[in-house]
Amino acid sequence: MDSIRQYFKRSDKIYLLLCIFSSVMAVLALSSWAAKQGNGFATDEVTGAIIGIGDYRRALVQAGASVIGIVIALLLSCVDYRSLVKVWPVHVVLTWGLVLPTLVIRNVSIGPLTIGYNAGDTDNYSWYKLGGFTFQPTELAKISFILTFAMHLNNVRSRINEPKELAKLLLHLLVPIAIIHVQGDDGTAIIYGIIGCCMMFAAGLSWKYIFAAFAAAGAAVAVAFAFFSDKIGKGYQWYRILAVLDPENTTGWAPSETVWKNIIYQQQRGEIALGSGGIFGNGLFTGRYYSVPNAHNDFILSWIGNVAGFVGCCVVLGVLLALVIKTFATGARSEDRLGSYTGAGIGGALMAQIAVNVGMNLRVLPVIGVTLPFYSAGGSSVLMLYICVGLVLSVYSHNTKSLFS
């Protein structure tokens, strides 16, 4: 009993409660969505009898994954994060060993397992499918990347602004980004980039390099759009970007009206759904609703706005913002740099995913397949998220004083 009491005394209970609250709200939102999809249940076409849980399966999977994830987070919080960094060769081989086959193997089935599965019929072949479940190994590799990059930064320390050391760090960052780009998952590649930038900023990267990076990125994007837009990337990716800049197609970027309507349809419906809820929403299980493609996944925020209104969105995003702040704060209070960089990496991942997903739903950023943490449907992504939660709790509970005190 004393050991349990001591554990809860040194753990970040508020952080864990915020995570649990988000998971409960996610299951509620997905249940609400399922209820509007033909009553959610699978029925017999002739008799109308209920023969399965239908779309409620997503809410059930989310609930089950959240419970398992919470247990994993609690167990992981008891493990010193430093020991996980020390065994970096193990998780690097395991995680990237799952990622690399998807570069060359596309939709190949070995019994019930499909390698290089393109979930959602896109050009993103970064998934594995086992029976009725899908898994994206780059999410697990993201955790390994944060730990190894934190170790790299910890080894470099004050030498981070030396060109030779900075070049090595950029190589460490750009190699996984390039691998993920080849897979066709540019959304995840962008998240990796933001994670790396947050961690290097926390490590003391000079502002001159930060400004130079932004200037170079801006110039590269401008040149790409001006001279190479027909050669770089896949057509639909550029169309999605142009649809945000010119949603009415006044410049004629879309080759046909059909392409234009197909590209803008999801965000257009999401924008309507988000605004239709007004202040308090149309009701979780009653009232009108607007159909939005992937409302259970990338566009779950539009669904929340539809059923719970502006107030519901503020509650959801307010709690997520609190989690981001507490994650960065946990890193800042760490007594060693390794914990500080780990917190910065996980905080950067959360911040990036939330910002990009909200931007997609508000139609200010293109659709790039980035999910909303805790809320978007997906059992494997929830489990990976709670592993990150466990790491943050580990940093919190294994530090008794601040690095900056």
What is the meaning of each model-derived region?
Residues 2-9, 13-17, 22, 28-29, ...:
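Membrane-helix boundary/helix-loop-helix interface segments in multi-pass membrane proteins
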Residues 63-72, 141-142, 307-325:
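Hydrophobic alpha-helical transmembrane segments
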Residues 71, 89-96, 163-181, 186-229, ...:
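Hydrophobic alpha-helical segments of polytopic membrane proteins
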Residues 71, 79, 148, 222, ...:
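Transmembrane alpha-helix boundary/anchor motif
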Residues 74, 147, 151, 196, ...:
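Transmembrane alpha-helix boundary and packing residues in multipass membrane permease domains
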Residues 112, 118-127, 212-315, 335-339:
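Hydrophobic, glycine- and aromatic-enriched re-entrant/interface helices and adjoining loop segments
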Residues 153, 190, 195-209, 285-312, ...:
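Interfacial segments of multi-pass membrane proteins
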Residues 330-369:
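Loop-to-helix entry and N-terminal half of a specific, functionally important transmembrane alpha helix
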